Amino acid sequence: MAAVAVAAAAAALRARILQVSSKVNSSWQPASSFSSSSVPTVKLFIDGKFIESKSDKWIDIHNPATNEVIGRVPESTKAEMDAAVSSCKRTFPAWADTSILSRQQVLLRYQQLIKENLKEIARLIMLEQGKTLADAEGDVFRGLQVVEHACSVTSLMLGDTMPSITKDMDLYSYRLPLGVCAGIAPFNFPAMIPLWMFPMAMVCGNTFLMKPSERVPGATMLLAKLFQDSGAPDGTLNIIHGQHEAVNFICDHPDIKAISFVGSNQAGEYIFERGSRHGKRVQANMGAKNHGVVMPDANKENTLNQLVGAAFGAAGQRCMALSTAILVGEAKKWLPELVERAKKLRVNAGDQPGADLGPLITPQAKERVCNLIDSGTKEGASILLDGRSIKVKGYENGNFVGPTIISNVKPNMTCYKEEIFGPVLVVLETDTLDEAIKIVNDNPYGNGTAIFTTNGATARKYSHLVDVGQVGVNVPIPVPLPMFSFTGSRASFRGDTNFYGKQGIQFYTQLKTITSQWKEEDASLSSPAVVMPTMGR
């Protein structure tokens, strides 16, 4: 039965990729075999059309639960990437001059279409990325919330005025779009992260070049089709595909004014440096090592549930996964119960009923996670729960790692210093809250952290002293809702303006200030003033 389900799921994905992205060649049909020459190809989206790439370089898309090839995505050619930017540049003046109310209406229609197609988008995510269907729906929903927030643009883009700054003179400023903006998205949130980017940028009047992860392009392609159906003019949103060459193209192209990136530290540092060197605004959300500090007065049952869910959900492939627990004082005694609770999680393919977590994205990701677990044992830590040898019936070729808990971890160990990005929770122990705060602050990352306590003074002390951009109090994954901004800090972020919220609007716009004087009478002096104007002195 499992094999039948796998085949059906793969067939469904092939059919949807074809339906969404092969508009230019309606005679092409998916073949019944899985050979690399017959699986559906993901198209480019340029000037409002889904176009077959002329590239001779193609990347296989795999179902992480089976490692079967379910699609192929091109590495866009230089000419194709140039055409995409040219389309953005050509359509920018008209889109920027479009009434903000009209742009708002496009986004209002878009959020409704996302709601209507949420389950279909989630299924694409599940097949390409490996998430459970429930988690994939959450991926889409959190992106949808940003789209809904973007619909408030008429309030978010209000300017400032100061009348009568001096006699007959007024001062006012307003926000204008930048031009062509670009986004580079990761594999772990195929819907949410693109929806952090292009809706916010485009409602401000920018046009947008999107490069989804080559591992999970399906959701972005469907989101682009829905955006077009919402009334967005052709050419305002364009999509290219690729790897290193596409990234360099985005960083270097003179017509691209701003870059949004989410992904690894290595890639983020590179993009920030190269893009900034070419005069672009860059915002880069990067790696993390998120700590959950457990105080002995915490609500025990709630805390254990929160730790397990935040550590192992999405197989740990979240930049806000709670990958590190610090047990303070008597909370150390809860460790056996934490292990027992994690053992109950069900590992399976994402579409299987009752699955709590699915596979990792690639065999290479699985190997890396297993090697980091190995490093813990070699460096003196203890493995209390080992998920390396897990086998999922019917999905023996999948990239599965079960929940893993490593105790007796020290800050100098590799499994602590590295971002694992898998279903692994490393556990440290301290005697005091101050020791826990020092551990968190000595770590270079600053994405998120959480404290579990019933003491308000303890929570306040931790929130104020910890050097992390996003703090949860009895909230394990403190990702802000989009009326606020995603405020990772230190080594987890590069740039000076964060994603979505008010800062998202600031990133995608520039200020223009007008100083205006309308005199009722003609000048009483016959000679010009050559000293610095003081305006109101």
Curated annotation (Swiss-Prot):
It comes from the Eukaryota. NAD(+) binds at A185, F187, K211, E214, R215, S264, E419. It is found in: Mitochondrion. The keyword Glycosyltransferase does not apply. The modification Phosphoserine is found at S264, S382. One of its GO terms (biological process) is valine catabolic process. It is an enzyme of class 1 (oxidoreductase). InterPro entries: Ald_DH/histidinol_DH, Ald_DH_C, Ald_DH_CS_CYS, Ald_DH_N, Aldehyde_DH_dom, MeMal-semiAld_DH. One of its GO terms (cellular component) is mitochondrion. The keyword Phosphoprotein applies. The modification N6-acetyllysine is found at K49, K54, K57, K78, K89, K119, K131, K300, K332, K333, K366, K378, K502. The N-terminus is blocked. The modification N6-succinyllysine is found at K49, K54, K57, K78, K119, K131, K366, K378, K393, K519. GO terms for molecular function: malonate-semialdehyde dehydrogenase (acetylating) activity; methylmalonate-semialdehyde dehydrogenase (acylating, NAD) activity. Residues 1-34 form a transit peptide. Keywords: Acetylation, Mitochondrion, NAD, Oxidoreductase, Phosphoprotein, Transit peptide. It catalyses: 2-methyl-3-oxopropanoate + NAD(+) + CoA + H2O = propanoyl-CoA + hydrogencarbonate + NADH + H(+); 3-oxopropanoate + NAD(+) + CoA + H2O = hydrogencarbonate + acetyl-CoA + NADH + H(+); (R)-2-methyl-3-oxopropanoate + NAD(+) + CoA + H2O = propanoyl-CoA + hydrogencarbonate + NADH + H(+); (S)-2-methyl-3-oxopropanoate + NAD(+) + CoA + H2O = propanoyl-CoA + hydrogencarbonate + NADH + H(+). Its EC number is 1.2.1.27. Disulfide bonds: none annotated. Belongs to the aldehyde dehydrogenase family. Homodimer. PANTHER family: MALONATE-SEMIALDEHYDE DEHYDROGENASE, METHYLMALONATE-SEMIALDEHYDE DEHYDROGENASE [ACYLATING], MITOCHONDRIAL. Malonate and methylmalonate semialdehyde dehydrogenase involved in the catabolism of valine, thymine, and compounds catabolized by way of beta-alanine, including uracil and cytidine. NCBIfam families: MMSDH. This is Methylmalonate-semialdehyde/malonate-semialdehyde dehydrogenase [acylating], mitochondrial. It comes from Bos taurus.
